[in-house]
Each structure stands twice: as structure tokens, then as C-alpha cells.
């Protein structure tokens, strides 16, 4: 675990480059439903591709958030917590990338922008103190959980592959929120939650198309 500021800086840069320019590799097998084949029409592939692109962007942002928060905290135990959560999100990043490839869809062209914006938010949250930083995690994961739940109703009913991935991601986000609460998160003020919701809406709307 890097301890010096210089070590953390280079680790943070490495994480950004890997997220944006290197094909991610999952440590956990991609979720699937045994015996459930996925046969989609062209229109359904387009629909699923757009939704999974949004989910992929969400995982790019998750990498940025956790990396920034790990960089900002001075608490070694909390840094390890953020690093572990980031590793979980790497699985999600790999799964969504794999599914995009299978659907013949591309990731968002604006991923560097999304990463930079999310990193800035994570760094700001981290500078405000560990309890607030953890509260930011709780609210983010709660919003992501709700977003993934909505995608389960929007994905084609017979897109079993995408649905299995989204369902597992949703379960993992619930666990991340609970872990952050146990680590000492404080609730964020309602105006902050509203701003986060508005920012997420912009991201999901744009990423659905670009």
C-alpha cells in the first residue's frame, strides 16, 4: 500500500490510465443465467447497448470517485476500504465492457470527461473529511442502486446476459453503501443530494447517446 504523497500520486495516475485506456480484467466471473440464451433483434441490441453504455460510464465514474477518495484520506484503514471497493467496481467495469463488445456497442466517447468530473467530486468529498466522504459514497451507491433497478425494467426481457450483470451490480452497490455506513458515514444535506441527482441525470442522458 503506497504511503507517501508521491506514491499515492503515481498510483492515482496509473489507476486513471488503466481505467480509460486499458481493457479491464475481472477477478470474478461475469454473471450469467445458466441455460438462458440471449437472442436479440437489432433494435433490442441498440436498446441494450445504450443502457449498458450508461452503466459502463457509471463504473468509470466509480473508479474515479474511489481513487480520488483513497488519495485524499489520511486514514490508512479507510484508504484500504476505498481501494477494495475500487477493485469490486473493476469487476463491474470489465463486465459492462464485455457486454458492450458482445452487443456491438461502443463505450461513451466522453469517458475522459466523466472520469475527470467524478475524480474532482471525489477529491472534494475527501477534502471535506472522512465522514462526509463516506456519506458521499452512501448517497452515490444508493442512487446507483435505484438507477440499476430502473434498468432492469428497461432492458429487453430476453436480454438475460445484460440483466444478470445489472442485477449483480445492484447487489454489490447495496453492499458498498452498507460498508460505508458501518465505516462512519454521515448523511449528506438534501440540497447536496439533489445536486448529485441532477448531475447524474445529465451524465446518464448524454451517455445514452454519446
Curated annotation (Swiss-Prot):
Cited InterPro entries: COQ7_proteobact (IPR047809), Ferritin-like (IPR012347), Ferritin-like_SF (IPR009078), Ubq_synth_Coq7 (IPR011566)
- Any Gene Ontology CC annotation: plasma membrane
Q: Which UniProt keywords apply?
A: Cell membrane, Iron, Membrane, Metal-binding, Monooxygenase, Oxidoreductase, Ubiquinone biosynthesis
CDD domains recorded: DMQH (cd01042)
BP GO annotations: ubiquinone biosynthetic process
Which reactions are catalysed by this chain? a 5-methoxy-2-methyl-3-(all-trans-polyprenyl)benzene-1,4-diol + AH2 + O2 = a 3-demethylubiquinol + A + H2O
Its EC number is: 1.14.99.60
Topology in the lipid bilayer is annotated as: Peripheral membrane protein
Q: Where does Fe cation 1 bind?
A: 59, 89, 92, 173
Q: Which cofactor does it need?
A: Fe cation
Stated family = Belongs to the COQ7 family.
Q: What is this protein called?
A: 3-demethoxyubiquinol 3-hydroxylase
Native source organism of the sequence: Albidiferax ferrireducens (strain ATCC BAA-621 / DSM 15236 / T118) (Rhodoferax ferrireducens)
Amino acid at each position: 500500500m503506497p504511503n507517501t504523497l508521491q506514491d499515492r500520486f503515481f498510483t492515482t495516475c496509473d489507476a486513471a490510465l488503466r481505467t480509460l485506456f486499458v481493457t479491464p480484467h475481472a477477478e470474478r466471473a461475469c454473471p450469467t443465467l445458466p441455460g438462458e440464451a440471449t437472442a436479440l433483434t437489432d433494435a433490442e441490441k441498440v436498446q441494450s447497448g445504450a443502457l449498458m453504455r450508461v452503466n459502463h460510464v457509471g463504473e468509470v465514474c466509480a473508479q474515479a470517485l474511489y481513487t480520488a477518495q483513497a488519495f485524499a484520506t489520511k486514514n490508512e484503514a479507510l484508504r484500504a476500504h476505498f481501494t477494495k471497493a475500487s477493485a469490486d467496481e473493476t469487476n463491474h467495469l470489465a463486465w459492462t465492457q464485455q457486454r458492450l463488445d458482445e452487443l456491438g456497442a461502443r463505450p461513451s466517447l466522453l469517458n475522459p470527461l466523466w472520469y475527470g468530473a467524478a475524480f474532482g467530486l471525489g477529491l472534494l468529498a475527501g477534502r471535506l473529511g472522512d465522514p462526509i466522504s463516506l456519506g458521499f459514497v452512501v448517497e452515490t451507491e444508493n442512487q446507483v442502486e435505484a438507477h440499476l433497478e430502473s434498468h432492469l425494467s428497461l432492458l429487453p426481457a430476453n436480454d438475460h446476459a445484460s440483466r444478470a450483470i445489472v442485477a449483480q451490480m445492484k447487489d454489490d452497490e447495496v453492499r458498498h453503501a452498507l460498508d460505508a455506513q458501518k465505516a462512519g458515514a454521515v448523511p449528506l444535506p438534501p440540497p447536496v443530494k439533489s445536486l448529485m441527482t441532477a448531475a447524474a441525470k445529465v451524465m446518464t442522458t448524454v451517455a445514452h447517446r454519446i
